[in-house]
Each structure stands twice: as C-alpha cells, then as structure tokens.
Amino acid sequence: MTNKLKNYFPMIRQKDELLEEIKKQPKLRAIYESWDLERREEFLNFCTGVRGIKILYDSFFKEVMNPEYVPERLENFLCEVLRRKVKIVRILPNDSTRIADEVSLLITDIVVELEDGSLANVEIQKIGYSFPGARSACYGADMLLRQYKRVRAKQGESFSYNDIKNVFLIVIYEKSPKELHQFPDIYYHHSRQTFDSGLKLDMLQEFIMIPLDIFRSKMHNKTIKTVFEAWLTFLSEDDPEKVIQLIERYPEFKPMYETLYQMCQNTERVMELFSEELRQLDRNTVKYMIEQQQQELDKQAEIIGQQKQELSQKDEQLSQMEERLKKQAKEMEELRRQLG
C-alpha cells in the first residue's frame, strides 16, 4: 500500500525514517508516547501512505480547503453542492449564538459570503446531532438574522429587504443521525420552504444535508462517475486504492493531497495538529455519550410519567367501581328490609 501512494506522491516518508526523527527529539517522542497504540498506528499510517489522510480532521480540512489562500477549492466544492456557479468574496467570522456544547461537537464550521451577497455555511459534524431538523432551522434563522443586522447597520435609512440574500446551511455528516438512515440510498438532501398553494416567494433559507457514511455504503465497489461523487470520495475515503482511483479519474484532486503530504514533512507541526484532533475527538465522544444518555433518561422519564398517569386513571376507575358496589350493597340491604 505504501509504495502505491508513494508512486503518486514521492514526498511520502518511510516509516523507519519518521520514527527515527521522532525518537531523536524529546518533545516529539513525548507527544508520540502520550498516544495509545491505535493512535500511533493511525498517525504513522497516514504519514507514510499506508492509509490516506483523513480530510475531515479540522486542521487538515482547513489546510487544503482554506478559502483565504485557495478559495477556488471551496468554490468548486460549493458549485457541486449548491448546483450553481459560486464565487467567494470573503470569509465571515462565525459569531453565532451556538451554545458551547454544540461548538465542541463540530469538526469544522466555515462561513463565507458569495458574489451575489448570499451566505454559505459549511459545517462538518463527526457525530450527527440529535434533532437535526430543529437545530438546522434555528441556526439557519440565526444566520439570516445576523445578515439582516449587518446589512441594516451598513445601509441605514436606505435599507431594503431586497438587500437580504439567501443563506445556505450545508451540513456534512461523517456519522449521520438516525433520521437520515430512513433513506439508505440517498446521500444528498436539499430543502427550501415552499407554499402548498403554489405561491412563489423566496423565503431565503436553504438546507443541504450530506451523510458521508451513507455515501460510502452506497458507493461500495462502485466507480466514481461524477465530480460530486469525487468530492465526497475525497472527503470520506482514506483507502489508498480509492485515493488512487480518484486522482487518476479526477487529477484536479492530486494537488490537494500534495498540500497535505507537504504538511506532513513538518513532523512537529503535524503531530501537534493530530494531538489537538484527538483531544477534540475525545471531547466530542464524551458530549455525544452525555447527550445520548440524557435522551434515554428523558425517554424513561416520559414512560414512567405515562405509567403513573395510567395507574392514576386505574386507581380512579377502581375507586368509582368501589363506590358503585357500596351503593348497590346499600340498595340490596334496603330491599331486604322491605321484604322482611
């Protein structure tokens, strides 16, 4: 496997060479030894080409898709996702009102302004949030409100609602929530608001959800046939055979891998970035487990509440039946007295 990728990327280093550098420098050795065996193997594998690089790690994604230095890459990706021509004008600060727990569950979150004034937010989640619809709707509304405040402050008295442009929330899931698995053959979900009467109004918010786990399952043993499939393969695959298939069929992706393998030449930097990814991954996992446990507790509390209500209703029914029996017993006693 190593030789196959090295044929395409000669800068890929040998395992012995990399380990020798790590052992010679106390700082690097300390970082390396702080990882468990699985993480050490993962690091060595992607640095030496045994596996491809995991593009979805935040540091790696931002290195290869940085809209400030190489905007054309993110532009090309957005063209495929939005299915329209895209030109990035500037990167916007992500000053949304997300709560801290939500921020910690994200891999990547980039907001850009497009040439027509619309906003696109690319959000990558390693583990899909619960309630993806409600969360997306709230964040989409927040994006729209932020744009409204910014434009109104800039335009002043000349402000017009016509100056408010579309906002696109693009959510890419490495592991998608259960709602998306109700559609096991679909890995592109697009939503915009419409009226059932046929009234045509642009409500400005559009949502796109891309479950990469479903894409990988769907593409198993299949050939990449479209640029969109090529992008999703780039984001989701670290299998060397898939990487080679991708760059042979779509050579425009090769420079992106070269960017990352060049980054791997700086061992100290890439080790520090990888360590930060691992820390974030651990936090993500803890947050996810807490959220799942809370959902289970809420569900159990709801069941207990329903059972209590049912028992209360049964107690009331028994009490009413007891009253009826007492009343019938009195009536029978009265009848006996009349007969006697």
Segments predicted by a language model, with ranges:
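Accessory alpha/beta interaction modules
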Residues: 1-206
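Short conserved micro-motifs at the rims of enzyme active sites and ligand-binding pockets
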Residues: 181-183, 219-223, 272-273
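Selected N-terminal structured segments and early membrane-anchoring regions
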Residues: 158-161, 167-168, 215, 260, ...
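Extended serine/threonine-enriched, polar tracts that run as long, contiguous segments within proteins
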Residues: 196-229
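Short hinge/gating elements
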Residues: 57-65, 155, 212-218, 242-246, ...
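Short acidic (Asp/Glu) and glycine-rich catalytic loops that position anionic groups and cofactors
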Residues: 54-56, 207-212, 234-239
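Short, charged alpha-helical interaction segments and adjacent helix-coil junctions
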Residues: 2-51, 120-125, 233-340
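Charged, alpha-helix-enriched surfaces in structured cytosolic catalytic cores
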Residues: 69, 73, 131, 226, ...
